[in-house]
């Protein structure tokens, strides 16, 4: 119950205080302050007497009395001053506030700090009692204008000044005084008031005072002024007008550039600590500085990246920037205006680096003018070209309005004799073609006119632009080109002119562009090709990337503007006698067989039946390349068009050239042979180099059998080349996909039913192939899939032992194998002497399964294949802990935008704990008290910091394999011994401690401990199920940093854990989470109208969701996206086995009322499709889906590019594999971005 003081009691205290000596006053003040702690109100009659007696007490030389008044009395007395009427507060501001402001200059910190706190209290009371009047109603002296509404009620004889303005006037007097400490403390008071009152306290009146303090003679004042300005103007809630006014004042009052640069960078960048280049504060832009410089003088800015960032505060600030530049671009360029022109161009580039074109795009585009590229001086023209290259990249389609005006100007520059300017200008044209979306008529007319020019340099650049245009725009602009009268004829005429050009370099580039033209307009291209003479047509066919035997220049050259003579170099052609080539192949095969016998003596060999020839090798062609709207996009296109060969049907019209084999390792044998090599590197990759893994087999010799068509040979076979990243590139012909899966549960080894798919290929005369499964294999596949549909729980079966522990290969070449068995490149020791490819008989292969091996089949990109027990491979070679957390993994996670707040917080907490880190690694008993506190559930911040530092200073390396030396094993045992008896206690204690209801600071530090454990002690982690439960429990938090931490941690666990084991754990944790957080009852459950039911599920505003619903959606989204990431690391057989369970998860999520959950369900379905590449099989996992839902799922597959291609449009094997890897990478990024939407930001 609050205490009350009567008027008589307060008057008695006041009387004692007036009559007492200074020492006695200290006791009275302190006692009265204690009485006021529980008092809510004082009698109004005693307020003014105390306010009048306070100034002498505050100015008293008695230090103890002064300290008592400031610390023990004022914090409790001032809040009791009544706000209404305001006469008491006005008296306090007139009497007490000046005395308090004087004490800001006191040398003792306890004095000036307490005085500052009292001033803040008076300011808060002033703003609460009388909100400030808008500045428009005040005159220059601070008094009310005569016509304002408030002045009509005020006393006409004495203008009325509001309480906030009275408080501000006194504080400004202090800031404009001479005492440096008063200024410093006054700015601190100002910062506190702004943080408390927010927008109610205007900034404009303070900016002039603060700018003056930036140039104060005292260094302490200047430093505090910088910090104050940054703290006041950097928050996002600060109005842009205040920042713009501040920039104007910096220039108007000539603040030093070093001071202004630092402040502007910190205020406007949003991440000033990460900036290495200060902003350009060109306050003298309007002055004709350097007008007398001679033409030979080189300006300071001459490099593409030597541009300082320019930060723009508001659209009005941007308009002023452009307005100050306009006078320099009026009229012709002269000796007087070329230097300001260059500075203006560089400044515009700096604005783009500061993202002004993104924040204020409309104002930026309105300010752009087209006369900046007309300069003929080298540096100025070069800067103009840099700007014109960056503008389309940054603005994209918003730059379309300038394209038609700029292309003729840049086209003229392509004929300049100054090679540097010509190259830069045409690089800008390439950027415009790549990133803008204007009508193709503009580009085609510009390119066609360039091809008609007499200058060979212009023609060379024009055909490069023609190639770029066809790569970027031909596919999607085909209808526009054909619908525009005469446009397709103009394009055709341009090709005819360029193919007949007198310059060989122009003709060479045109031939490369022609085949892209041929893909889009095949009939017109055929007519054009048939009209050429024999020699020209022969050269054109030789440039066809589908038939060229050696890599041609890639389409990446379209974005470069090299010299025209660079295209004159022709690929060397070599001929070799057929007999010599065959003899060399036989010799290489024999040597490889001997080497394989010596290396793998006693090991089983898997020998497949011979495979007939398949279509020849061709180079990858860019088909249907989408137009990119960014530099990243064009880089992706260039990568797609790299000269790495892939296999696809060869047109029958082109002849296959014979090429010699450069090395014995690349010689192919008539038989597909798979040899398991015992090597220390076998667990990761074979000893083949990446170049060999990517190298294509050479084109076959002419047919030796009448039954084989042109380009087919009995020497054609299937070889498996292990790539450097663990992926296998399978040759053409009959392809067996091994799908015998080895999975384990609680250390026991099991096998899932074998599922072997084979593609029978039937070669046609036109080079295309129809692939279908043989009836027997299709029947077996259907049986396996049907049996798996009825499984409700994960079922791990023991394989039935084969008689004699052998597998036999059938006459159709069906070889059972497992993804966990290493398949290395090699050839057989003895080859059948047969030229027709018919081999009778069977090879019996012995294969003993290793009962201790553990491996979940991964997808081709991420799997490390295991061999059988005949190869001496240690158990648990590919366990959930085969690889440690590498710096590359951590760096890749830190670069993601979605969890930036967590990484900043983690670094901040690690830096705070660094003083506790000992110089040498501490012994294990040093953290025993900290572990005990953690187990009790009540650790302090220091306990958690010490545990985190101990984890980082005692890392444990991955468990060494049997092939590694004893020293590595001893080092592992020593590192592991440190954690004996400690690790389980730390891990379990941390996971149990991490609960959303914990203190935020302790919870964040606990997350740091968990990250240190995963990063440095991952080989010791056994219970990932407990860890998953803990992560789902943290999804109940509403703190964005905690949620971001769980997102980043699960992304890391997907990379380093066994995906099958993690998938089971995530499923279990998701079920547990959804059981704890059931879905709210749906009001539309009984609604028979499907349209009304669908509309009722739409959430028009996220603010309408209850906290329980937001928590459920956050965890649900987290689980679905995590499962999707695991799916992308699994192989097709495992997905087939787990499909029904995954389908049940998808179906439940698709029917969820939340749109974000439905979106996550479709993303999970897309992840499954990325692995299976069969939409029918994918949709069969969710049989309960309606036809409309299935159609929507297929639509999403097509839009995301994961829908399989059939018939004539089906990609070749190697090209398809490359595309599938890209699909998985893109889908992983999409899932990570979708997961970030579950972060609740309040």
Swiss-Prot record:
InterPro entries membership: ARM-like, ARM-type_fold, CLASP_N_dom
Record field: compositional bias (Basic and acidic residues): 574-593, 748-767
Ranges for region Disordered: 138-161, 538-612, 637-711, 748-839, 853-884, 1077-1111
Compartment annotation: Cytoplasm, Cytoskeleton; Nucleus; Cytoplasm, Cytoskeleton, Spindle
GO molecular function, one term: microtubule binding
UniProt keyword Cytoplasm, yes or no: yes
Composition-biased stretches (Low complexity): 138-156, 548-567, 640-660, 701-711, 1082-1104
Main location: cytoplasm
Gene3D superfamilies from the UniProt entry: Leucine-rich Repeat Variant (1.25.10.10)
Superkingdom, taxonomy of origin: Eukaryota
GO CC term (a single one): nucleus
The keyword Cell cycle is annotated on this UniProt entry: yes
Annotated GO biological process: cell division; mitotic spindle assembly
Key words of the record: Cell cycle, Cell division, Cytoplasm, Cytoskeleton, Microtubule, Mitosis, Nucleus
Coiled-coil region(s): none
Pfam families: CLASP_N
Database matches in PANTHER family: CLASP, CLIP-ASSOCIATING PROTEIN
Assembly information from the UniProt record: Interacts with microtubules.
Task performed by this protein: Microtubule binding protein that promotes the stabilization of dynamic microtubules. Required for mitotic spindle formation.
Family according to the record: Belongs to the CLASP family.
Protein name, as recorded: Protein STU1
Gene name of the encoded protein: STU1
């Amino acid at each position: 119950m609050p205490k009350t003081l009567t008027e008589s009691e307060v008057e008695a205290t006041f009387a004692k205080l007036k009559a007492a000596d200074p020492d006695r006053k200290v006791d009275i003040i302190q006692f009265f302050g204690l009485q006021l702690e529980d008092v809510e109100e004082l009698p109004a009659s005693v307020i003014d007497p105390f306010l009048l007696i306070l100034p002498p007490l505050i100015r008293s030389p008695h230090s103890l009395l002064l300290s008592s008044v400031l610390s023990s009395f004022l914090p409790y007395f001032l809040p009791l001053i009544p706000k209404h009427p305001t006469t008491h507060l006005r008296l306090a501001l007139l009497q007490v506030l000046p005395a308090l402001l004087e004490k800001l200059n006191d040398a003792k910190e306890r004095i000036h700090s307490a005085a500052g706190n009292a001033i803040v209290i008076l300011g808060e009371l002033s703003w609460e009692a009388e909100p400030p009047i808008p500045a428009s109603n005040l005159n220059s002296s601070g008094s009310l204008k005569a016509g304002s509404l408030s002045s009509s009620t005020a006393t006409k004889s004495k203008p009325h000044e509001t309480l906030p303005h009275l408080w501000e006037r006194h504080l400004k007097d202090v800031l404009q005084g001479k005492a440096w400490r008063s200024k410093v403390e006054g700015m601190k008071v100002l910062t506190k008031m702004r943080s408390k009152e927010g927008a109610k306290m205007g900034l404009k009146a303070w900016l002039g005072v603060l700018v003056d303090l930036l140039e104060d003679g005292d260094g302490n004042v200047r430093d505090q002024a910088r910090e104050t300005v940054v703290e006041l103007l950097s928050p996002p809630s600060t109005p842009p007008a205040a920042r713009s006014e501040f920039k104007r004042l910096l220039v108007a009052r000539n603040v030093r550039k070093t001071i202004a640069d630092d402040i502007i960078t910190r205020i406007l960048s949003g991440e000033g600590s990460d900036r290495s280049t200060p902003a350009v504060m060109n306050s003298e832009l309007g002055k004709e500085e350097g007008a007398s410089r001679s033409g030979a003088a080189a300006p300071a800015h001459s490099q593409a990246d030597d541009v300082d960032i320019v930060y723009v505060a508001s659209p009005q600030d941007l308009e002023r920037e452009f307005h100050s530049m306009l006078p320099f671009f009026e009229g012709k360029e002269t000796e007087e205006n070329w230097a300001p022109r260059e500075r203006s161009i560089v400044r515009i580039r700096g604005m783009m680096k500061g993202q002004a074109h993104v924040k204020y795009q409309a104002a930026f585009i309105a300010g752009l003018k087209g006369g900046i590229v007309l300069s003929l001086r080298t540096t100025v023209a070069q800067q103009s070209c840099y700007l014109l290259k960056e503008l389309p990249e940054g603005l994209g389609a918003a730059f379309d309005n300038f394209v038609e005006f700029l292309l003729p100007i840049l086209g003229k520059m392509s004929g300049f004799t100054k090679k540097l300017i010509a190259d830069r200008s045409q690089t800008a044209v390439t950027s415009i073609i790549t990133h803008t979306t204007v009508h193709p008529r503009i580009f085609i007319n510009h390119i066609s006119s360039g091809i008609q020019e007499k200058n060979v340099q212009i023609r060379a650049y024009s055909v490069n632009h023609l190639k770029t245009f066809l790569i970027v725009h031909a596919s999607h602009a085909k209808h526009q080109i054909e619908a525009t009268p005469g446009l397709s004829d103009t394009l055709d005429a341009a090709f005819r002119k360029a193919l007949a050009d007198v310059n060989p370099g122009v003709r060479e580039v045109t031939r490369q562009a022609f085949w892209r033209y041929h893909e889009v307009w095949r009939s017109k291209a055929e007519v054009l090709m048939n009209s050429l003479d024999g020699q020209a047509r022969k050269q054109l066919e030789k440039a066809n990337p589908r038939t060229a035997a050696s890599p041609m220049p890639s389409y990446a050259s379209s974005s470069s503007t090299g010299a025209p003579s660079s295209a004159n170099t022709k690929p060397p052609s070599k001929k070799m006698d057929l007999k010599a080539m065959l003899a060399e192949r036989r010799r290489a095969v024999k040597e490889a067989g001997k080497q394989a016998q010596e290396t793998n003596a006693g090991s089983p060999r898997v020998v497949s039946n011979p495979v007939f020839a398949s279509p020849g090798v061709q180079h990858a062609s860019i088909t249907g390349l989408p137009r990119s709207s960014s530099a990243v996009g064009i880089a992706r296109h260039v990568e797609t068009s790299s000269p790495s060969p892939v296999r696809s049907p060869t047109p029958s019209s082109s002849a296959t050239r014979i090429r010699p084999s450069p090395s014995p390792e690349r010689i192919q044998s008539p038989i597909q042979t798979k040899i398991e090599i015992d090597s220390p590197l076998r667990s990761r990759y074979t000893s083949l180099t990446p170049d060999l893994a990517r190298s294509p087999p050479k084109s076959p010799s002419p047919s030796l059998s009448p039954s084989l068509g042109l380009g087919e040979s009995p020497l054609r076979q299937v070889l498996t080349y292990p790539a450097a990243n663990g992926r296998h590139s399978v040759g053409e012909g009959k392809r067996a996909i091994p799908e015998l899966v080895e999975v384990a549960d609680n250390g026991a080894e099991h096998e899932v039913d074998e599922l072997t798919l084979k593609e029978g290929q039937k070669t046609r005369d036109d080079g295309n192939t129809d692939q279908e499964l043989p009836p027997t294999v299709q029947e077996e596949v259907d049986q396996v899939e049907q049996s798996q549909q009825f499984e409700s729980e994960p079922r791990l079966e023991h394989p039935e032992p084969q008689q004699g522990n052998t597998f036999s290969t059938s006459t159709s070449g069906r070889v059972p194998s497992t993804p966990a068995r290493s398949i290395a490149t090699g050839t057989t020791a003895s080859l059948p002497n047969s030229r027709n490819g018919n081999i009778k008989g069977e090879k019996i292969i012995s294969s003993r399964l290793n009962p201790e091996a553990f491996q979940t089949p991964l997808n081709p990109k991420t799997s490390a294949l295991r061999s059988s027990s005949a190869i001496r491979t240690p158990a648990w070679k590919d366990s959930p802990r085969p690889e440690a957390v590498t710096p590359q993994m951590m760096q890749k996670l830190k670069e993601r935008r979605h969890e930036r707040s967590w990484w900043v917080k983690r670094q901040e907490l690690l830096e705070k704990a660094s003083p506790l880190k000992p110089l040498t690694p501490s012994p294990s008993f040093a953290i025993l008290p900290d572990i005990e506190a953690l187990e009790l559930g009540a650790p302090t911040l220091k306990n958690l910091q010490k545990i985190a530092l101990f984890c980082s200073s005692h890392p444990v390396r991955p468990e060494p394999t049997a092939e590694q030396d004893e020293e590595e094993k001893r080092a592992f045992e020593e590192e592991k011994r440190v954690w004996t008896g400690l690790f389980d206690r730390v891990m379990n204690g941390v996971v149990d401690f991490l609960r959303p209801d914990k203190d935020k600071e302790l919870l964040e530090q606990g997350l740091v401990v968990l990250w240190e454990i995963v990063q440095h002690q991952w080989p010791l982690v056994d219970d990932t199920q407990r860890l998953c439960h803990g992560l789902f429990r943290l999804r109940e938090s509403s703190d964005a940093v905690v949620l971001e931490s769980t997102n980043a941690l699960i992304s890391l666990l997907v990379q380093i854990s066994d995906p099958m084991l993690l998938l089971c754990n995530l499923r279990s944790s998701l079920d547990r989470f959804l059981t704890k957080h059931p879905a709210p009852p749906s009001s539309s459950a009984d609604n028979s109208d499907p349209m009304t039911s669908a509309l009722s599920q739409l959430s028009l505003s996220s603010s309408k969701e209850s906290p329980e619903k937001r928590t459920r959606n956050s965890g649900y989204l987290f689980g679905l996206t995590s499962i999707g990431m695991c799916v992308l690391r699994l192989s097709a057989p495992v997905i087939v086995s787990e499909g029904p369970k995954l389908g049940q998860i998808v179906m439940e999520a698709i029917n969820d009322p939340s749109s974000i959950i439905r979106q996550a369900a479709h993303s999970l379905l897309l992840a499954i499709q990325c692995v299976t590449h069969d939409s029918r099989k994918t949709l069969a996992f969710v049989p309960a889906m309606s036809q409309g839902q299935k159609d929507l799922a297929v639509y999403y597959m097509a839009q995301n590019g994961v829908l399989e291609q059939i018939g004539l449009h089906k990609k070749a094997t190697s090209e398809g594999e490359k595309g599938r890897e890209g699909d998985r990478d893109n889908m992983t990024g999409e899932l990570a971005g979708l997961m970030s939407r579950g972060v609740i930001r309040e």
